[in-house]
Curated annotation (Swiss-Prot):
Keyword hit for Repeat: yes
InterPro entries xref list: Keratin_matx, KRTAP_PMG
Protein name: Keratin-associated protein 26-1
Annotated family: Belongs to the PMG family.
Alphabetized GO MF terms: structural molecule activity
Length: 210
């Protein structure tokens, strides 16, 4: 089975993924004499002519890991300087991610090439935790992801299997110094007013000479 649409070039194929600078004049666009599984040199950028070596020796049948996760017709790019485009794995930005696998040499139509690399092809260097691990007495609703993934390598759907509380968000009632209804004030109020000095209820005139 041959791949009718793909690009190739000449370069050493030692590692799984190699960047090469190849002049456009030496690129043979989309020949039909190479079968699936052969080494391809796919462009990562049409500006600097950097090509990616795809040494993924896979069968002609496109495996699950080589299928685009999501195809958006409005989010396309064209490579090889022609009207033919290819699904090229994009490297994950950031030091904590590596490509999990490369796509086979089978070519995919332009309608199935996302503009940005999808995180399903990326795996963290340190595996995510498979369960929630509370730190202290935390309520379940207070869990948050331990770290954020790079914006250039975001998953299609939110991942919830690798969460860890970044801080304890305990929903405990805080004391507002509320006075209980059974407490009395320090200075109880009297039901009536009492003068500081005694006032006689009757007045007696002083003696005066008549």
């Amino acid at each position: 089975m041959s791949c009718p649409n793909y690009c190739s070039g000449n370069s050493n194929s030692g590692s799984l993924r190699t960047s090469r600078h190849i002049p456009l004049t030496s690129i043979d666009l989309c020949p039909t004499s190479v079968s699936c599984g052969d080494v391809l040199y796919l462009p990562t950028s049409s500006q600097d002519h950097t090509w990616v070596t795809d040494n993924c020796q896979e069968t002609c049948g496109e495996p699950t890991s080589c299928q685009p996760v999501h195809c958006e017709t409005g989010n396309l790019e064209t490579s090889c300087g022609s009207s033919t485009a290819y699904y090229v794995p994009r490297p994950c930005q950031g030091s904590s991610f590596l490509p999990a696998s490369f796509f086979s040499s089978s070519c995919l139509p332009v309608s199935c090439r996302p503009q940005r690399y999808v995180s399903s092809g990326c795996r963290p260097l340190r595996p995510l935790l498979n369960s929630y691990q509370p730190i202290g007495d935390c309520v379940p609703n207070a869990y948050r992801p331990q770290f954020c993934l790079s914006k250039s390598c975001q998953p299609q759907n939110l991942l919830t299997s690798g969460c860890q509380p970044s801080s304890c968000l305990a929903y405990r009632p805080q004391s507002l110094h509320v006075v209980s209804s059974s407490l009395r004030p320090l200075g109880p109020l009297f039901s009536g007013c009492q003068p500081l000095t005694h006032v006689f209820s009757t007045c007696r005139p002083s003696c005066s000479g008549l």
